[in-house]
Design a protein with these regions (language model features):
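Acidic, glycine/proline-rich Ca2+-coordinating loop motifs
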Residues: 1-178
Length: 178
């Protein structure tokens, strides 16, 4: 049941946490058919299930290896940093992106990755339900993220809607990401 004591049918607490799946591309067979191997357990992803609604795969720390961010619904986000040996280490809390600036979880859904302030570091924008403000985490030195939603005035946004997806781009063609 939910926090209000009523039974939930579709809420995040109504289902067990899901284990994300990771498949490694092993190349192609003789007839050009691609083959994949399930490396979920060996990679370390299986040890951290969650109600992920959004995902972004990107080299967040600039080491040349792809990392994985999960926007989790009403639970702390997960950030798996590639250890360059086939394994990932969950570091969302350590890097400041598990919770918002108030230490709370949100109905995290859509994920957009962008260098919003042109400092060479990738930032993460996450959308939520209509009753919540979307969140922008800016990356700082040593790969630490901070919730910059309020300081950047995004908590005063005039648009309020459920955001199941997010796309970051230079929509007005002025050389800066929007």
């Amino acid at each position: 049941s939910g926090k209000d004591g009523k039974r939930e049918f579709c809420g995040p607490d109504g289902f067990p946490p899901a284990v994300p799946k990771l498949f490694e591309n092993k190349g192609t067979l003789n007839q050009g058919i691609p083959t994949f191997q399930d490396t979920t357990v060996a990679s370390g992803l299986a040890s951290h299930p969650g109600p992920g609604l959004g995902v972004a795969c990107y080299d967040f720390d600039g080491d040349g290896w792809v990392d994985i961010f999960f926007a989790d619904d009403a639970k702390p986000n997960r950030l798996f940093m590639n250890q360059q040996n086939g394994k990932f280490e969950e570091q969302a809390l350590k890097r400041g992106i598990a919770l918002d600036a108030m230490g709370q979880t949100k109905a995290n859904m859509g994920v957009g990755v962008v260098d919003i302030n042109s400092d060479g570091l990738i930032d993460i924008f996450v959308t939520h339900l209509v009753t919540e403000r979307h969140t922008l985490w800016q990356q700082g030195p040593q790969g630490m993220f901070s919730d910059r939603t309020a300081p950047l005035g995004l908590n005063q946004s005039s648009w309020r809607g459920t955001g199941f997806g997010a796309v970051m781009a230079d929509f007005d063609n002025n050389g800066f990401s929007d």
